A protein has these predicted regions:
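Generic, well-ordered alpha-helical scaffold segments in large soluble proteins
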Residues: 17, 21, 36, 40, ...
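Conserved RNase H-like, two-metal-ion catalytic cores of nucleic-acid enzymes
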Residues: 1-82
């Protein structure tokens, strides 16, 4: 895990891999991750951002979707639930998504209302609640572990190539 808020930097090999369509990146709802990372790379590391485009595509200023696969698509193909928490309920899956996640995301990722009690800030930073920050990091790590557990469970049931082709078009 790289803590950008604490001043840590993403290793160059990770930055390069993000834009390399020959390296498959996995996430649950990977289009969300791909679009967010596209914007972040464009702003912070434009030298590592590689946009794709095809004729008639009005949203081609993102990382190429061919470098991404999605566990939510895999789950849908298998007829499973379409939430990470829902799939985490699959029998035998050791790692489970943390229920505190929504509150932590709201605290650290959504602007807050400036009040007298919070010193007029509009953004909660790690130093405003170190315990919540530690839990937030653990929550993010756990999501990765749940994602990896899902892939291990589903590995015997691969998604056909035509489904990935449709996913990349979408």
């Amino acid at each position: 895990m790289v803590d950008l808020a604490a001043g840590e930097e993403i290793p160059v090999e990770i930055l390069s891999a993000l834009a390399d369509e020959n390296i498959t990146k996995w996430a649950f709802n990977s289009n969300f991750e791909r679009v967010c990372l596209s914007e972040w790379l464009r702003r912070n590391y434009p030298e590592y951002f590689d946009s794709y485009s095809v004729d008639g595509d009005t949203v081609g200023n993102y990382l190429n979707p061919r470098g991404w696969k999605c566990s939510m698509i895999w789950s849908a193909f298998m007829g499973l639930r379409l939430s990470l928490a829902g799939i985490g309920a699959v029998p035998g899956l050791e790692e489970q998504k943390l229920k505190e996640g929504k509150d932590l995301i709201r605290y650290f990722c959504v602007p807050c209302k400036a009040t007298k009690s919070n010193g007029g800030r509009t953004r909660n930073l790690p130093e405003h609640d170190e315990d919540k920050c530690k839990l937030f990091k653990f929550y993010n790590q756990r999501d990765v572990e749940v994602e990896q557990s899902i892939q291990k469970k589903l590995v015997k049931y691969p998604v056909p190539d035509f489904v990935w082709e449709e996913f990349w078009l979408d």
